[in-house]
From Swiss-Prot:
Organism of origin: Hylobates lar
Sites where the protein binds ADP: T239, Y252, T253, G302, S303, G304, K305, S306, T307, H603
Annotated NACHT domain residues: 293-618
Self-association state and partner proteins as the record states: Homooligomer: homooligomerizes following muramyl dipeptide (MDP)-binding, promoting RIPK2 recruitment. Interacts (via CARD domain) with RIPK2 (via CARD domain). Following RIPK2 recruitment, RIPK2 homooligomerizes via its CARD domain and forms long filaments named RIPosomes. Interacts (via CARD domain) with ubiquitin; inhibiting interaction with RIPK2. Component of a signaling complex consisting of ARHGEF2, NOD2 and RIPK2. Interacts with ANKRD17 (via N-terminus). Interacts with HSPA1A; the interaction enhances NOD2 stability.
Lipid bilayer topology: Lipid-anchor
Protein name per Swiss-Prot or TrEMBL: Nucleotide-binding oligomerization domain-containing protein 2
Entry superkingdom: Eukaryota
PTM comment: Palmitoylated by ZDHHC5; palmitoylation is required for proper recruitment to the bacterial entry site and hence for proper signaling upon cognate peptidoglycan detection. Palmitoylation promotes localization to the cell membrane. Palmitoylation protects from SQSTM1/p62-dependent autophagic degradation.
Chain residues carrying a lipid of type S-palmitoyl cysteine: C395, C1033
Disulphide linkage map: none
Domain CARD stretches: 26-122, 126-218
Gene: NOD2
PANTHER family found in the cross-reference section: NACHT, LRR AND CARD DOMAINS-CONTAINING
Record remark: domains: The ATG16L1-binding motif mediates interaction with ATG16L1.
GO cellular component entries: basolateral plasma membrane; cell surface; cytoplasm; cytoskeleton; cytosol; extrinsic component of plasma membrane; mitochondrion; plasma membrane
Amino acid sequence: MGEEGGSVSHDEEERASVLLGQYLGCEMCSQEAFQAQRSQLVELLVSGSLEGFESVLDWLLSWEVLSWEDYEGFHLLGQPLSHLARRLLDTVWNKGTWACQKLIAAAQEAQADSQSPKLHGCWDPHSLHPARDLQSHRPAIVRRLHSHVEGVLDLAWERGFVSQYECDEIRLPIFTPSQRARRLLDLATVKANGLAAFLLQHVQELPVPLALPLEAATCRKYMAKLRTTVSAQSRFLSTYDGAETLCLEDIYTENVLEVWADVGTAGPPPKSPATLGLEELFSTPGHLNDDADTVLVVGEAGSGKSTLLQRLHLLWAAGRDFQEFLFVFPFSCRQLQCMAKPLSVRTLLFEHCCWPDVGQEDIFQLLLDHPDRVLLTFDGFDEFKFRFTDRERHCSPTDPTSVQTLLFNLLQGNLLKNARKVVTSRPAAVSAFLRKYIRTEFNLKGFSEQGIELYLRKRHREPGVADRLIRLLQATSALHGLCHLPVFSWMVSKCHQELLLQEGGSPKTTTDMYLLILQHFLLHAIPPDSASQGLGPSLLRGRLPTLLHLGRLALWGLGMCCYVFSAQQLQAAQVSPDDISLGFLVRAKGVVPGSTAPLEFLHITFQCFFAAFYLALSADVPPALLRHLFNCGRPGNSPVARLLPTLCIQGSEGKDSSVAALLQKAEPHNLQITAAFLAGLLSREHWGLLAECQTSEKALLRRQACARWCLARSLRKHFHSIPPAAPGEAKSMHAMPGFIWLIRSLYEMQEERLARKAARGLNVGHLKLTFCSVGPAECAALAFVLQHLRRPVALQLDYNSVGDIGVEQLLPCLGVCKALYLRDNNISDRGICKLIECALHCEQLQKLVLFNNKLTDGCAHSMAKLLACRQNFLALRLGNNHITPAGAQVLAEGLRGNTSLQFLGFWGNRVGDEGAQALAEALGDHQSLRWLSLVGNNIGSVGAQALALMLAKNVMLEELCLEENHIQDEGVCSLAEGLKKNSSLKILKLSNNCITYLGAKALLQALERNDTILEVWLRGNIFSLEEVDKLGCRDIRLLL
């Protein structure tokens, strides 16, 4: 609604129209109906922006629904729009049915104005009551004043109607033109010096605004230039090595994109996040902050965040999607941080993205007037060296300020409010401060298994090549696990010949993969007749100076938070054109116009790899300095720093060498990647390779010993910091992502002795790793260490990205798991069937929690076999999957032969009456089950009858959960009969089942004969207030 703050997307416009349609009839606008639909009305009022809300206020004020005092109460700066909307609903409701009807009409008028602007009526310019007429015709006068506020203000000042101070207040840059017009009208209402009469007469003489200025020639010309510019930047995929020109359209493969769900809020268990398409980025419900403008996409390094934005840009430029935006401005955070001079919003958009050839003033004013048609994207926020803060406020779009202040205020909405912003970042760089200003957060989880295969087929169209690569990955689970990150899929594609010809085994660790790509580049840099079979010492030694130059540059860049290098910086690091020709440094993307082309590493992970290579082999790095790397930051500067305490390592060291200073200043998440690479390079697997390149084998041995000691000591310190267990409970550890990197580093070293030593120190009964970005590679590292535990552990990996490949990686440690929690991990039947095949032989495993995955009837036979074969298995939780009656019937067969299961969860599946019947028949004589959940399974009276027969026979079940089904009175009466014969059930949950007073009376009769049952839940059923009171008095065990 409204000019400057129109509805932010076509989807929201359509939703607002639907909501309005529900209230067009007067009979729908009673106070009772108005109050009943309060949440929808709030959504309607906030579906656009503050401009739309103020348009509604204009109409209500003009119709005298709101008094002047009411109106002033809605002008509290800084109040969230949702708060203002709720206050307006309260005010209108208190005024009666007529006011409620007028609010709906005002919303309708405001929306019509936003879609097809028009003037409403006319007024007498010589009215005897000018202030009253200004209010009566306020919507039309605001629109007429919109483009002429400056001129009218100047004229009013010249004639003495307003002071200079009042002019400055109205002209504050935080206000849009329509808001300035409203503030001028507000001033006229309270001034008795003729300003109202002047405005009423002068505004009538202003030209009628026939349409929004979006069709002006200068605007069309700039939009065309911007589309052409963005299209040119996004049409071709910038491959990591810069050696290929690939059309993005031909090679783009969708990643797994999920909206972040807040599992800590009250209410029913959240559904599994659906895999979203890119086109749903701005239309997904479930906002963290409805008043925010910024969309956040988080993902690990190499997960495809930049390519996702490139795809968005291309779809917009080609006119295929995101057409609600007329202007899209892409920015790279690693480029932005290089801007030392102060800049304004105008400078940022025009000088650093796309320059208007004509009409700069008009185009910039258009952007300010219609921010809802603007999209800004900021790629790589984790590479922006300035930490987010909201302390320094900057609201002027024309006044210059520092680049960090400008960016932070754009994200907060202090600048270009209602313009959409998309930010990509690694998770570790997103602070709680920033999340306050995030509208929606998405997780980019890399390729699915199908995505890996599709990408390889797009990259290799030659007959048989993709098939051979896919077979190789499927036979090599460690390599397959790495490839869920697109950067590794690119490496596999790039090195496909080396992988298919390799006889010594496929890469297992991240370091193995990066050494393989290093071999590929080195071999392609020498004549074909000189190429060796692999990365031998001679090949590496021949280019060692180049690799050390690149390593020195990489380390300096990490320490200075610099990821784009000028010619001067390359020269200072002694990087020669010959070094650049190796291919690891490429032209930076998104180069600032007018500047010389700087260079950057293929990817941030390559910069970390070369920094680790330098630390492993440079004679300038004393071994004792490595402690700074494993500190991951200044002492006490971050949770990671506290996790890895400063280590005292024997050996001489200067007061503060330059390498030490760089390591102390680098970002912790980059140091973690570097530390893992260093551990891999110093492993026994690669010892021979590095030893041939090192003049002093003793120095290399000292580095290796230092890395081992650092890892062992850091893990030991971390384990010792775990608080003792509460009396009667198992010792529990809730790990942080920093712990995952320690385990990853240990895995990169591939030393069983170190893994055993680490496992000995992990004396916990419950290891919790929720929300730790655990993917298949992390699963391999965890299994490498946990398989050596001496006591069984409950391993909780909820809300990660384990997937089928990760499940396969976990199998080596399944024997030491007494419980395995894998909720929300995108696991399918294939992964679970492999897990169960192994679990059949793991006597320790007694509990599986698999909520919110992608399980179907296809895994039912495996589940049934597990139940039938494992007579010490205690709990199976399958909530919110896709199990139908057929799957429930198969599982029931497994239950018939089971004598140990105590907890069985099926909520949110689709077992229906047939499935409920099969389960009930299997459980009638079951001697161990204590808890059964069939919530939300489309069970009716037939299923309830079968469950009632089960209750009549079963003597062990203590809790039966049947909420959100269709049991109704007939089913409840059957259950009541079963309760009369039951002696074990303590809790029966029947909320939201369309039960009336008749069904409740049957339950009351059953309760008279049953002293065991403690609670019967009946909330959300069909009872009047009088019936609720009556039932509650009859038996307090009824929870209504």
